[in-house]
Amino acid sequence: MKRKILIAVGDCSHSRSAVKYAATLSQPAKDTTYTLYNIQAAIPGILLEEAPKNPECEAEIEALVRERDNAAKCTVGELKELLVKHGVPESHIEVWITPMEYGMAKDILDQAEAGNYDTIVLGSKGLTPRRDVFVGTTATKVVEHALKTSVWVVDEYTESRDILIAVDASENSLHVLDHVIASIGGKKGFRFVLFHVRPYLSHYYSLECERNNPNLQKLIQDRDRHRMEDFYKEAFARFETAGIARSQVEIKTNEHGYDISTAILEEARRGAYGTVVIGRRGEREAFFTGRIAMRLVQKMPSAALWVVA
């Protein structure tokens, strides 16, 4: 199955970390392509309108554009070499350099949709224009609005091959596993931890409702245990089919996670995982959606965070 990875890059250390991470972690399959996507800072419209009236200003703008273009080509060229150095065939790498049109995050999302990319990879910092710094980072906005494309946010390069995958018993969690398996393939040395937060009525309603309905609380947890047993059977079958040994996969359950994002953050930091993976949707309406994904990308519990669409 053909896979396309869009790596949004700039001249910053976080972009270099993102490129190296994508090259070393993802499976360099023969049908996987990597696009290095560089968005150049736009020349303010007022300068473009007024400069032609002043030859000296027009010459300065032309020099500024040449300098910008040359810097972008140099940056992307270095990052392409980094991909090749870490095992990606040069024939699998595409380069796209373009001026900003609507804004950094919007342009990345539009390119991902137009190119039908499976995954967006970007650094947690470094791509946000100065004028947008108080609006929110590019990574945060991409995660918030990439409803159909998975996003990998990389804070720093890591050699850790420990991956924490937050799961519930939903079909979407199986889709998350499929994304992990397709991205990593049968590469050796990885450890996968399937992390489940036991459901509470307070995940749906108030704490008072939970206290006042002990039978419902027991019912929801008993049912969850049975459903997770079925989920794990299917999960192990999919790992095995992909060539991932049973010894590489662990199960962890948080029985007292009244706040789901906090439970994930605590486990991620306690276990010092290199990568944390969550799904955008789950059984509980708020389980891995908006609020939780946004909190995790702001806190960055690991070197890399995946939000799987």
Please report, for each region that a protein language model flagged, where it lies by residue:
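A conditional alpha-helix N-cap/helix-loop micro-motif detector
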Residues: S15, E101-Y102, S173, G257-Y258, ...
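Gly/Ser-rich helix-loop-strand patches that form or flank binding pockets
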Residues: R3-K4, Y21-P28, D107-E159, E266-A309
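Structural beta-alpha unit
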Residues: M1, P44, R66, E78-I120, ...
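Membrane-embedded alpha-helical bundles that form conduits across membranes
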Residues: C57-E58, G185, N213, I260-A263, ...
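A short acidic, glycine-rich active-site loop
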Residues: C57-C74, P214-D230
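Short, solvent-exposed amphipathic alpha-helices that sit
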Residues: Y21, A71-L79, D107, H226-A235, ...
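Small/aliphatic-rich secondary-structure junction motif
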Residues: M1-E62, R161-K218, A237-E250, K299, ...
